[in-house]
A protein has these predicted regions:
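Conserved, structured core segments of small domains
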Residues: 1-106
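A conserved alpha-helical element in kinase catalytic cores
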Residues: 108-118, 133, 143-184, 193-212
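An alpha-helical support segment within catalytic cores of ATP-dependent transferases
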Residues: 111, 215-275, 285, 365-370
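Conserved ATP phosphate-binding architecture of protein kinases
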Residues: 135-139
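A glycine-centered beta->alpha junction motif in the catalytic cores
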Residues: 151, 179-198, 236-244, 342-359
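Active-site Asp-x-Gly
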Residues: 272, 284-330
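Hydrophobic residue at the +6 position relative to the catalytic HRD Asp in the kinase catalytic loop
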Residues: 280-282
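Helix-rich C-terminal or lid/interface subdomains of diverse kinases
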Residues: 308-372
Length: 372
């Protein structure tokens, strides 16, 4: 791969990038300057200021004629650069002193170059995933998901993957940096399950996965990377966080804390559970459930994950009742209703932040549960 500095007609802004990519190949510029990837840094890398600047990352393996390039060379292409050769396009800027600003995107390119030899691959495709996640995520060559987050969280994800390595529905970690600066997952092809078409089939897979959870013998409760003192403390924290985003008219806290008190007297199974087990992390292909991604590994009760999954999508909620969940989980009605009340309160908070259009349905379900 080479990284080129492009000016004039090879530049475009981020908003028009997708539209541009859909229409034509990129015409060659009269001003394309080569930069060696390992020499890009904020201290020694700068260009004379022009109106617009773009970094163009090109996979030289896909070019018919690979130009001989060294740092500082100006390159002239006689033909348009094929889109298949474009790995990434990155606008960059100058500060008030006309000094080049090393953007996070450039750092990402350098980071990916560091990873490629560890995977023993030549990178010919590079894509960002930024769909509502707190992690920094890339897709390489359509096969590898590279994730950056806090080392504590990534370590817990790696351990979760190892624990369930024999479960084909749980995404597999294939590489972890020794200090957990990043981990690399296998990519599960498909689409996020925004719409649930086959509820019975999905519930079968939800039950199959939650029934497969293994005992957790560590001292932690709740999130492994940010543990609580107990399972009940974890639930109280989740409820408190949810209460901060719900309006005062949602005067449901007395019922929620009563439900927490009920759970204190119910059987508790301490298992290693997914922790963010919702349809937003379920992948489907050709209508079929094929896998689950993005765990927040948690030491907790499998019932938490089961109900979390059922509440994560309004298509499922419309079919729920306490009796239905008792039948599906085999847990007592007392425990199911208590966990349902707690989880539903937290789900209404998430709904306000991510999909407000469903809130009325969740509120209606709340009153339905309270009336039972």
């Amino acid at each position: 791969m080479i990284i080129l500095h492009c000016t004039q007609q090879t530049t475009w802004n981020k908003e028009s990038q997708n539209e541009f990519f859909g229409n034509t190949d990129i015409e060659a510029s009269n001003s394309i300057k080569c930069i060696e990837p390992n020499k890009i840094n904020a201290e020694n890398f700068s260009f004379p200021s022009t109106i617009e600047h773009t970094i163009l990352c090109i996979n030289t393996d896909l070019l018919k004629k690979v130009p001989s390039t060294q740092e500082g060379d100006f390159i002239y292409f006689s033909e348009p650069i094929p889109l298949s050769a474009i790995i990434a396009t990155i606008p960059y800027a100058y500060d008030s002193e006309d000094k080049f600003i090393l953007t996070r995107d450039i750092q990402d390119i350098m980071f990916i170059n560091e990873i490629s030899p560890k995977l023993d691959i030549s990178i010919n495709e590079f894509k960002y995933f930024r769909d509502g996640t707190d992690s920094r995520i890339f897709l390489l060559n359509g096969k590898y998901i590279v994730k950056q987050n806090t080392p504590a969280l990534l370590k817990s994800e790696f351990e979760f993957s190892k624990t369930y390595s024999e479960n084909s529905k749980i995404q597999r970690v294939i590489l972890a940096e020794e200090n957990y600066k990043y981990i690399v997952y296998e990519f599960i092809p498909g689409d996020v399950m925004h719409v649930v078409e086959h509820i019975d089939d999905l519930l079968f897979h939800i039950k199959e996965i939650t029934n497969s959870y293994k005992d957790y013998t560590g001292p932690e409760f709740g999130y492994i990377h940010e543990p609580s003192n107990s399972w009940i403390d974890f639930l109280k924290t989740k409820v408190h966080e949810a209460s901060l985003t719900l309006p005062d008219s949602f005067d449901f806290l007395p019922q929620v804390y009563e439900a927490i008190s009920t759970l204190e007297h119910c059987d508790f199974q301490k298992k290693l559970i997914h922790g963010d087990f919702g349809t937003h992390n379920f992948i489907k292909k050709n209508g079929d459930f094929v896998g689950v991604i993005d765990p927040i590994p948690t030491a907790g009760d499998p019932l938490y994950d089961f109900i979390y999954a059922c509440l994560s999508n309004i298509d499922i909620v419309k079919h729920l009742s306490v009796e239905f969940l008792v039948e599906k989980t085999g847990e007592s009605a007392e425990k199911v209703k208590a966990m349902l009340i707690i989880s539903l309160f937290c789900r209404m908070s998430a709904c306000l932040r991510h999909h407000k259009e469903d809130l009325d349905n969740y509120v209606d379900f709340w009153y339905q549960i309270m009336a039972d």
